[in-house]
Amino acid sequence: MSPIALTRLLMLAAVWGASFLFMRIIAPVLGTLPTAFFRVSIACAGLLVILALMRVRWDFNGKLKACLLLGMINSGIPATLYSVAAQVLPAGYSAIFNATTPLMGVLIGALLFREPMTLTKLSGIFLGLFGVGILSGAGPVAFDAQLLQGALSCLAATTCYGFAGFLARRWLDQQGGLDSRLSALGSMLGATLLLLPLFGYSVLTQPPASWGGWDVWLSLLGLGLVCTAFAYILYFRLLSEIGPVKASTVTFMIPAFGVLWGAWLLDESLSMAHLYGGLLIAVALWLVLKPAAVGRAVRA
């Protein structure tokens, strides 16, 4: 991995780590669908301005439909799921569950896209799941139905991420490539189109008790413009440069940022379970991302 790609990966980890902090502020006030919709729609508006200022030519090269569908899978659905999780999980929890993305990517790649699977990777997957299990007892939240709902929401979101990474490589990169800024815009457009009718129905039937104060809307701007618009430009650039599995290793670093942001700015407590679970996931990801040559291939 080149130094530039590594720098982008670190920037993306820092930015996405902060997103869990913002959602923890926003989601309990606005609710699930408003949080998800405002996140992607603000990101979409921000990308429109960025592309206009940079005078980027709007040439999707016949890939607009693919970008829209990717946006639904990679942004719209996960944004909703993480908004659900943010109402019941501390920011650090969501960030650490998000670290299972490469594990999901390995499984999906082997089962659906004929990516090589090794015994080493299988060991990493089970070790990672064990680490996530330890995390369910971390911090101030007792294990109950709400915690389980939040955890399953995060894991469903990471499954979407893993699936979308391979689709992006097949639909975009392997067919001539596409400017990462256009990929990000198309993705946000797709997510916005998916969530718009759901948001409208939600507001009409169950409007939020409060639309929040300045802190909520400043957090929304940060979530939409920095943690989504800017982040997805970086993400699609990394997908093109290093591939979906290596790009997904950004989630290896996100938990550290997520836990630190939560402890520093939201006064969320830290425990040894955070450390043990995070270390297990770190070892699991190292096993999963080792070159296939060091392990014995297993047919999926």
Segment roles from a protein language model:
Residues L47, I108, M117-G139, L195, ...:
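Hydrophobic transmembrane alpha-helices of multi-pass small-molecule transport proteins
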Residues I26, T35, R39, A85, ...:
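Hydrophobic/aromatic residues within transmembrane alpha-helices
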Residues F22-V29, Q87, S136-L147, Q174, ...:
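Membrane-interface helix termini and inter-helical loops of multi-pass transporters
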Residues A13, A36-F38, S75, A79, ...:
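Helix-helix packing/entry segments at the starts of transmembrane helices
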Residues G17, L21, L48, M72-G76, ...:
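Hydrophobic/small/kink-forming positions within alpha-helical transmembrane segments
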Residues V15, S19-F20, L48-N98, I134, ...:
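Specific transmembrane alpha-helical segments of multi-pass solute transporters/efflux pumps
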Residues I4-R8, P34-V49, L69, G124-F130, ...:
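Hydrophobic alpha-helical transmembrane segments of multi-pass integral membrane proteins
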Residues G31-T32, P90, F113-T118, G176-D179, ...:
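A helix-boundary/kink motif common to multi-pass secondary transporters
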